[in-house]
Amino acid sequence: MTLTDTTIDWDLATDALVESLRDLIRIASINPPSADAPDGELRAARYLATTLEGAGLTPELVEPVPGRGSVHIRLRGDGTGGDPLLLLSHLDVVPAPPERWTHAPFDADLADGYIYGRGAVDMKGMVAMELAVILQLAAEARAAGLDPARDPIPGLRRDVLFTCTADEEAGGAAGAAWLVEHRPEWLAAAGAVNEAGAVSTTVAGIRFYPIGVAEKGYAAYRILVSGTWGHGSMPREDNAAVLAAAVIGRLAEPETIRLTPVMTRFLDDAAAALPAGAARVARAIASGDDALSAATLEGLCDRRDAVVLRALLRDTISPDVIHAGVKYNVIPGDAVIEVDCRVLPGTTESAMRARLVERMGPELAAACTIELIIWGEPVEAPAEGSLFDIMAQAIRDHDPDGVPLPVMVPFATDAKYTAHLGVPTYGFSPLRFEADERLLDRFHGVDERVSVAALRWGLPVLYDVVRRFCG
């Protein structure tokens, strides 16, 4: 069944989606929980459970840590189509100090066609969109005289799982990681639809829809720098703050380009769609020549896109925290640097650590001890095959001028846990943005917002993907 076979009122469905999203934003599911909102994730999970129960469904809710809730529902197909499709989302949001917001971050204001609030794009908008698809499928079952909690949904050959987790923003220990150990059936599927992909980005007048098929791995390190304590009136070369500054200077230099298969495909597909001049730039970047790429990158896209693209072409090292010194006239003998590294597929933790030492050089490295804080493997899914092809075709059907293409994202999501279960997981939260809008400007940003028009476009796209993959 496709959209052309239905009489769904998508405007009415979008109105309900918008109200669900606004309700969810008003639940301050902040991670880490605050004294003012200690149980926001649990309240968000209960909201979804209550909404699903109102549609005649029987959701499950778990609370592995007090105040941290995850929720799940399974809609049944007739069992002839193989393993399920997983619609995966998270309920938690990062903090949102309100001082610079023009609309309070948890008021869910609707202004000028946009819904404002923390979580509008990361990722309660997708939660509400997935919820709308589930409610639509349940309504179709009821219209056929069936019980959606028990009977197969008309036209579905696979089950559809809808799982919303806690704790994604802090690593997932109280969310997806717990589910892998205790409720793996909530995640086990033939494929998963996740956040951070299929949101349009306009380059050289072309609307691209990058579908996330890979995520960089991550390694955080604590670098302990040893110097000699002394009096500030007698400067010395082994001042730990000075040594730390030198370390940071060396680590901050960009790594060399290393093209992965996903990014080679991304650049090739982009070049095929771009006007001639921009296409030449894309091919120049794909050549892997560092000097050429650095000079030409911003000829392909604006600075916002260039920052992202640079990160996807290399391993990255970002010194983000430094502590040194106790008083202005005391030379510090110790300093601490915390470094965020994001690694391409093929880079191991030991290789990243060795690279830090190499970048420091032997003299500085001798003054440093490197401790691993956290490590996560890169994640990859096939950039071809049934689910990817269905997602790409759904975008083309709803935006004939749009260009879907595979991409890697620079950050980590709950896909790192579904990958442990062998579930190919894709960044696919379809939204059609205006030409000057960028998704990553909104993630964790001030005045986070999403337009009603973008949601109205994305809802039938997601519904089509579910129907086509599961039908």
Please name every model-derived segment:
Residues 2-119, 143-158:
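Acidic/His- and Gly-rich active-site-bordering loop/insert found
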Residues 111-122, 404-405, 446:
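Short pre-catalytic strand/loop immediately N-terminal to key active-site residues, enriched for Gly-Thr
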Residues 184-191, 197-206, 211-220, 232-322, ...:
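Acidic-enriched catalytic cores of C-N bond-cleaving enzymes acting on peptides and small amides
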